[in-house]
Structures are given as C-alpha cells and as structure tokens.
C-alpha cells in the first residue's frame, strides 16, 4: 500500500509543469553597464560601478507568471535613486530587468553604499524581497 502511495506521489510531482515552480532569483547586483542575460549565464564577474561610471542595478529571475510585478531599484544607503517596474503580460522562464543611469551624474555619484533592491509581487502579495550586498562607489 505504501509503495502505491509513494508511486502516485512521484507521478503527481513529475506531472507538475516547469512553469509551476517557485520563482527564484538567478542574479542580483550592480554593474557599470547594462548587462545581458548571456553575460549573467557565463557567470563572469561584472565590473562594479564607481563614482565616475554609469551604475545599473540588475536582476535575472526564473519562473515568473503572468501578472507578477517585478521592481528593481538602485539604492544609496536607504534612499531609492532609480527604479524600474514591470507587470508581466505572460509567463517568463527567465526575465531580466535593470534600472540605473547610463551616464554619470554631474560631479559623480553621491557618497554612500549602494545596492540593488528587488521586489517580486504575485497576486498583490510580496513573493520575493531581496537586496544585493552594499558596495561603496570609490
């Protein structure tokens, strides 16, 4: 009897489609340029922003569903500076979202520690809230 129950459980789990998996963060961080999914897939270290370079907060997320709301922010200490928000029109196996500035603010970036902050909302409830480690812009 137990064998039949375990077999039925294995069949039920195996039949769940891939899109039903939980959303998960594949990458979250800061770079000195707009990143591509190919760069993130390679896993090579990305150049960190400095006070006199562009600064882009990025995230790559897997298994998002239609209607999910994804927000990425470039944050200095506790002050959000720039953000990008997208409501997905369809399911996404992998989704890349970025926010930042391709240029450099006059006089450079303000002093402080910067990080990327991510929020994913599903059905009006927070699903993921995560931040990258803070880095100073030297």
Language-model features and meaning:
Residues 126-138:
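Short beta-strand elements
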Residues 18-55, 138:
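Short, compositionally biased P/S/T/A/G/V-rich stretches that sit at domain boundaries
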Residues 110-121:
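A short tyrosine-centered beta-strand micro-motif
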Residues 80-93:
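Solvent-exposed serine/threonine-rich low-complexity stretches and specific carbohydrate-binding patches
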Residues 91-104:
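Aromatic sugar-binding surface patches on proteins
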Residues 72-76, 120:
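Conserved aromatic beta-strand anchor motif in extracellular beta-sandwich/beta-rich domains
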Residues 56-62, 73:
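Short edge beta-strand/loop segments characteristic of extracellular beta-sandwich folds
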